Design a protein with these regions (language model features):
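C-terminal-most transmembrane helix of multi-pass membrane proteins
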Residues: 244-314
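Helix-helix packing/entry segments at the starts of transmembrane helices
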Residues: 96-101, 168-183, 220-251
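Transmembrane alpha-helices of multi-pass small-molecule transport proteins
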Residues: 30-78, 157-160, 180-196
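Loop-to-transmembrane-helix transition segments
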Residues: 5-12, 52-53, 58-82, 146-154, ...
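Transmembrane alpha-helical segments that form core, pore/gating elements
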Residues: 22-25, 33, 48, 140-201, ...
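Hydrophobic transmembrane alpha-helices of multi-pass small-molecule transport proteins
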Residues: 121-137, 154, 261-280
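C-terminal transmembrane-helix exit sites in multi-pass transporters
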Residues: 85, 102-124, 244-263
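Hydrophobic/small/kink-forming positions within alpha-helical transmembrane segments
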Residues: 14-19, 49, 73-81, 103-108, ...
Length: 314
């Protein structure tokens, strides 16, 4: 039953991540982006810090790699601002689908940034995946908007976060990497909103802000638990249930209906992403895979697998 339990935890994590996106889209209809990023990050960070004892206390945040963490905080801010800016201005399913190009970008970036070898099959999958992006954006159709570019920029930032996590994984704990990429967007949004007049949330607004912060933590915990109990090659396909949930929610809440090009492009991106996962991690260590992806800054990508915390964070 461990696999069934892992799939259940994964689905909880995925749905919580989708809940975060739904809260964000609703919040951004009324409140400024920088206010949302700040309060969402503040609430999420407060919850994470309350769990510090489970990860070795605040001593787990000690680091000598401040330059790397500064870079990662900027990348995390770019990822969060880019994704939520775009999602607020385009159909939910379109934004989620474009966001799933991050694993393809990570594969491509691993060659120049890490010197890794990527075989022709994975390169073909990457090219096919970006062909799916072109199907969604349809150059010349007017679908290439600044919002779409912002989401792709966010996916690029997520990919860079994953690459830098690979560089830092031998010396930095997963908890440390996660905390700093939550604190980064909060700091950047605080600077950007300095002197601005924030809208005081009403009761419904505070509920949405709290739900957004809680959903981000539940997503992280659910995915962490899932990848402790089953391999990425088994669980990865279930992450794409976010697209099904996003399509249903977009239709029911905002009357958004994806056209045939978005559906076709999504299928190509999903197929390419799954192929890359199976080729890259099918026979690799789940610990290595998890330590790489966890610190990408996206709760929906947070993964860890191992027998003991010391094995993971040592």
């Amino acid at each position: 039953m461990p696999v069934a339990r892992a799939i259940g935890l994964l689905l909880i994590g995925v749905m919580a991540g989708l809940g975060l996106d739904l809260c964000a889209k609703a919040i951004l209809e009324t409140y400024p982006l920088e206010q949302f990023v700040f309060l969402r990050s503040l609430i999420g960070l407060s919850i994470f810090l309350s769990l510090a004892r489970q990860f070795g206390g605040l001593a787990a945040l000690a680091t000598r790699k401040w330059g790397w963490h500064l870079l990662r905080t900027l990348l995390a801010a770019g990822a969060m601002f880019g994704f939520f800016y775009g999602m607020a201005r385009m159909p939910l399913i379109d934004a989620l689908t474009l966001g799933f190009t991050a694993p393809l970008m990570m594969t491509a970036l691993s060659v120049p940034m890490l010197g890794e070898h990527v075989g022709w099959r994975r390169w073909l999958a990457v090219v096919a995946g970006f062909g799916g992006v072109l199907m969604i954006l349809r150059p010349g159709s007017g679908a290439i908007t600044f919002a779409a570019v912002a989401v792709l920029f966010a996916a690029f930032c997520y990919a860079c976060l994953a690459i830098t996590a690979r560089r830092l994984a031998p010396t930095e704990s997963t908890y440390c990497l996660s905390i700093y990429v939550i604190a980064g967007p909060m700091a950047v949004s605080g600077v950007l909103s300095a002197g601005a007049t924030w809208q005081v949330p009403d009761t419904a607004g505070w509920i949405l802000f709290m739900l957004a912060g809680i959903c981000s933590v539940v997503a992280w915990i659910g995915l962490v638990g899932a990848y402790r109990q089953a391999s990425p090659s088994i669980l990865a396909p279930f992450e794409y249930t976010a697209l099904i949930g996003g399509a249903i929610a977009g239709y029911l809440i905002w009357d958004e209906v994806p056209d045939r090009w978005v559906v076709a492009g999504a299928l190509v991106i999903i197929g390419s992403g799954l192929f890359v996962v199976y080729r890259e991690v099918g026979g690799a260590s789940s610990i290595r895979y998890l330590r790489t992806i966890t610190a990408s800054g996206s709760a929906s990508l947070a993964r860890r697998f191992g027998k003991t915390r010391s094995e993971l964070d040592g």
